[in-house]
């Protein structure tokens, strides 16, 4: 099998006005899934594919990741793929959440939500041979949509991974060298997945839409999970809680190993990625209940200290040859103690 993973994130209509400065974790995560079963994928930034630096006819499976705004670019690469290769085209990432996406870009399969276990299942059904599984088999795979003679079939979402399942995954690190400017770019490393903001956006909603039961703000952690009126959780513009659920943290060991290997490859700007960095380890404080409260409990100071101190001791970071920063955080968790920890290890960096 010879799969090609195309990173089209943040490429919009296919032209950028500035050099790529950010390398997300998604493509490396999918590459890690393939590597875990002995398949060596090629990761290609979309700009190189657009310059025709890759002969698509030599690959038998295309995996494209992108955002909703990247639709023109994704459509263009799939159109070219269909002309030059006979293998299936699969799309993932935020763009795959659109129920009409397959009809719009003419891909064969879309993976919605957490894609790692879904991809493994598809590979076991024949995708590893460069063929699309039979329709009867696809109908049983959760977390996908696929094209049929009658249109698009959208299957139910796959249940979210447990923290242990999530922590068992190992993103690829050597494929970072596929990006020409990886030594200068900010390279994202996922430290947790999901979001604790299970408040529902209310605003001026009618009583028929929201009866102001306040369950999502004052109920127990389990009670906040589902809304009686089926309003999606989180910020009104964001799908993270709906797709990925409450936060689940990776172990310090797995994060440390990934960062260490990336530094060894030559990466010099590490960004610890999370919808809210101060959620790291908070899920451990409430297990087995889901972390659906964005304010309580307070940050897990011990977990934050262990993570940041361990990473800061890695030679390139400790010696000032590489930098460590975080992606973002939510203000309602910035207690004085948390601020001191962040200032101790991330001084001079931006959030």
Model-assigned labels for residue ranges:
Residues 2-18, 61:
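Nucleotide-activated donor-dependent transferases that construct or modify glycoconjugates
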Residues 2-6, 252, 256-351:
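Conserved SAM/AdoMet-binding glycine-rich loop
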Residues 12-27, 295-302:
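Glycine- and acidic-residue-enriched helix-capping/strand-helix junction motifs
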Residues 20, 174-241, 256, 263, ...:
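N-terminal pre-triad scaffold of radical SAM enzymes
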Residues 25-41, 315:
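Short helix-loop-beta junction
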Residues 34, 77-81, 311:
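Hydrophobic positions in alpha-helices of CheY-like receiver
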Residues 40-159:
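Glycine-rich beta-alpha loop elements in corrinoid/cobalamin-binding modules
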């Amino acid at each position: 099998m010879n799969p090609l993973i195309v990173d089209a994130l943040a490429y919009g209509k296919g032209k950028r006005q500035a050099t790529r400065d950010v390398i997300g974790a998604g493509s490396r995560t999918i590459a890690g899934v393939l590597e875990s079963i002995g398949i060596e994928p090629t990761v290609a930034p979309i700009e190189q594919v657009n310059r025709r630096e890759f002969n698509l006819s030599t690959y038998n499976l295309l995996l494209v990741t992108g955002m909703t705004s990247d639709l023109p670019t994704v459509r263009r690469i799939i159109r070219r793929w269909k002309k030059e290769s006979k293998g299936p085209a699969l799309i993932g990432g935020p763009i795959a959440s659109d129920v009409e996406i397959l009809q719009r870009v003419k891909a064969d399969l879309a993976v919605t939500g957490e894609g790692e276990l879904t991809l493994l299942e598809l590979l076991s059904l024949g995708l590893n041979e460069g063929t699309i599984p039979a329709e009867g088999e696809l109908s049983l795979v959760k977390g996908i949509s696929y094209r049929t003679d009658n249109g698009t079939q959208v299957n139910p979402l796959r249940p979210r991974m447990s923290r242990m399942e999530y922590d068992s995954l190992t993103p690829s690190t050597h494929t970072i060298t596929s990006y020409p400017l990886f030594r200068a770019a900010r390279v994202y490393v996922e430290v947790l997945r999901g979001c604790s903001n299970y408040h529902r956006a209310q605003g001026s909603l009618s009583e028929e839409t929201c009866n102001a039961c306040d369950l999502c703000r004052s109920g127990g952690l389990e009670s906040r999970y589902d809304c009686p009126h089926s309003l999606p959780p989180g910020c009104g513009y964001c799908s993270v809680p709906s797709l990925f659920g409450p936060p689940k943290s990776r172990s310090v060991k797995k994060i440390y190993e990934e960062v260490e290997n990336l530094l060894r490859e030559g990466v010099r700007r590490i960004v610890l990625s999370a919808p809210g960095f101060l959620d790291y380890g908070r899920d451990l404080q409430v297990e087995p209940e889901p972390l659906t409260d964005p304010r309580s409990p307070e940050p897990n100071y011990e977990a934050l200290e262990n993570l940041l101190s361990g990473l800061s001791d890695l030679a390139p970071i400790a010696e000032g040859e590489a930098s460590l920063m975080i992606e973002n955080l939510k203000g309602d968790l910035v207690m004085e103690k948390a601020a001191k920890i962040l200032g101790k290890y991330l001084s001079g960096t931006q959030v």
